[in-house]
Amino acid sequence: MKKALALLLCAALTLTLFAGCGEKPPAVPVTTGEIGVLRDEAFGNIYLDLTIDAFNDLGFAFGDSVDVALPGGEALEDIPYYSGYYVPVGSPLLCGYPGYPHPVIAYNYGDPTWETYGMTDDAVVTVTLREKGKFAATQDLFSLQYSDERADFDSDQIFANFREVTGGSLKPKTLYRSASPCDNQHGRAAYANRFAEAAGVRFVLNLSDSEGTYIGYTAAADFDSAYYDALYRAGNVLMLAMNANYRADAFAATLSEALYAMAVHEGPCLVHCVEGKDRTGFVCALLLALSYATADEITADYMITYANYYGVTKETRPDTYEAIRANVDDFLRCICEAGPDAPVASLNLHDGAVRYLRRGGLSDTQIAAVETFLTK
């Protein structure tokens, strides 16, 4: 009894001391503890082995700053936790992207983190909250999430993010872009397939899938893309399974070879990834640059996707629009091998596109064939 009373008095004294100092008792750290990892097969990044909701239930929230302890004593410190890739190109973040099965440790348009950090299937990482809400202003500025319900969009075409790419000297009815006509995770595949058939698409650059993942889609009960499958069976769909690191030499080599394959096939050509947004956006920017389009034309094409998915325009969300538009500036600087502060208006986009394809391994004759396929 005396021992219990002494413990109570000690606890009361401790609380009194904290109250007298105007301080609270130390908070329990918000952390995952050591947690397993999974390889993100699409992009080669590190998934945490829990769902986004389960991660948030631990006390994390979008806009927080976190520290990530990795194997071998490596760490990513003070990085943002966002619901999208709202960091500069090449910067690290923890991302709980809507529709992803797990939070992912990634570099925005950067090297795959699984290989970068030498991860193995039995590896563990630890994520710890560093500062609550440190990046909340950026999270609030972007804070984009779209619906997968057709009824929430004005038309089937907007829902499918399907459109003809236009600008510069690009020939009419030559190049199209869309959400995936085969991967139905967002419920858009059948719509994109229907528009591809109506446009008379004869060749497809599938930037996101491998042969194996595609076969998996065709076995699903909801697969309803007969036209796309007929193109695939005829050898007219190129499965590229590319990540999003468009600055990498391997990306340039794979893409350049694919564009030459496009040039020697019958068009029109459809370019797509999953959403038809990021990888597709870069590829279309490159093809428009090769077709003598202006930076404004390339930007306008890219931003249609954000109007389609999120309703983001210059008029509806000007600050968000401008922040997203900066992605195109980085595309064009990459294509032209320009520095991060180079004025986009000073870049020769066509010559930059030619040099990019040379870096990717194409000869001048092959590059001319790609340009001839595209332009009037």
Per-segment meaning from a language model:
Residues 1-8:
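Positively charged n-region of N-terminal signal peptides that target proteins for export
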Residues 270-274:
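Active-site cradle of extracellular carbohydrate-active enzymes
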Residues 15-26:
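Sec-dependent signal peptide cleavage junction
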Residues 23-24, 102, 109-111, 115-269, ...:
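Cys-dependent protein tyrosine phosphatase-like superfamily
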Residues 8-16:
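Bacterial N-terminal signal peptides
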Residues 25-107, 113-128:
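Long, compositionally biased stretches
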Residues 275, 279-280:
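Ser/Thr-glycine-rich phosphate-binding loops at phosphate-binding pockets of nucleotides
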